[in-house]
């Protein structure tokens, strides 16, 4: 597999304002429940990482299983039916949902133990995300599973659509893999709007590592009228 150099735009222009695309902030004013949720998710990620590259013996794994079963029993009474604060149709989406929705998002939420640790920023009219993948996301030896690569494109492309306030449900997502996405190296995702139509937005993006093009993607997002 070849590894062509990235021909696309480089880092953001000097002086260009940068802000988070989604309402996910850190700091001393973070609500106590959110801080505790993130701490619990971080601990859960460590457990998942240990289980996806196991080196422990049966006795240790039995002890871990018993501890996790006890913790699951503690959390069980507090489960909700959905991560959304209020029920809504499956086809309903908002460009700027409640921050709690982003907090528990399966692809970027810091309180979701399976979400890759991606940080998505607004750089002008582009969405730029950086993420380092660990063993939890390994597919081929030393590389990220292609399904995870595609999932990250889904969230970075719709983040670009959010900047232009044309976010919607994913209609199509096409990914072209140019090189393996390595583990334990910073991966940069970029996306921008190419065209906006009556009810759809066409968005494209790329991922790179140290200037090497890893994959490219195009997506069509369908805007759904708010109820």
Where are these regions (language model features)?
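HotDog/MaoC-like acyl-thioester-processing domains
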Residues: 2-96, 181-183, 194-227
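Active-site helix/loop of acyl-thioester processing domains in fatty-acid/polyketide metabolism
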Residues: 9, 122-126, 144-167
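Hydrophobic beta-strand-centered segment that forms part of the acyl-chain substrate-binding groove
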Residues: 21-28, 156-188
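Catalytic strand-loop segment that frames the active site of acyl-thioester-processing enzymes
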Residues: 32-47, 107-143
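Eukaryote-specific, low-hydrophobicity, charge-rich regions
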Residues: 72-126, 130
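Alpha-helix N-cap/helix-initiation motif
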Residues: 141-142, 146, 180
């Amino acid at each position: 597999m070849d590894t062509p150099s990235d021909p696309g735009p480089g880092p953001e222009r000097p002086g260009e304002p940068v802000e988070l695309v989604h309402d996910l902030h850190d700091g001393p004013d973070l609500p106590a429940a959110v801080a505790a949720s993130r701490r619990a998710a971080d601990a859960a990620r460590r457990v998942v990482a240990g289980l996806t590259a196991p080196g422990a013996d049966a006795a240790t794994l039995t002890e871990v299983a018993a501890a996790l079963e006890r913790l699951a029993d503690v959390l069980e009474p507090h489960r909700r039916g959905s991560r959304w604060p209020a029920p809504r149709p499956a086809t309903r989406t908002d460009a700027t949902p409640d921050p709690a929705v982003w907090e528990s998002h399966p692809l970027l939420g810091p309180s979701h133990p399976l979400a890759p640790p991606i940080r998505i920023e607004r750089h002008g009219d582009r969405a730029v995300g950086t993420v380092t993948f660990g063993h939890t996301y390994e597919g081929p030896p030393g590389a990220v599973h292609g399904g995870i690569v595609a999932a990250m494109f889904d969230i970075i492309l719709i983040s670009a659509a959010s900047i232009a306030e044309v976010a919607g449900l994913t209609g199509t997502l096409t990914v072209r893999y140019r090189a393996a996405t390595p583990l334990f190296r910073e991966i940069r995702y970029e996306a921008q709007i190419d065209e906006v139509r009556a009810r759809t937005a066409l968005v494209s993006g790329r991922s790179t590592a140290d200037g090497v093009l890893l994959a490219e993607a195009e997506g069509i997002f369908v805007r759904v009228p708010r109820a």
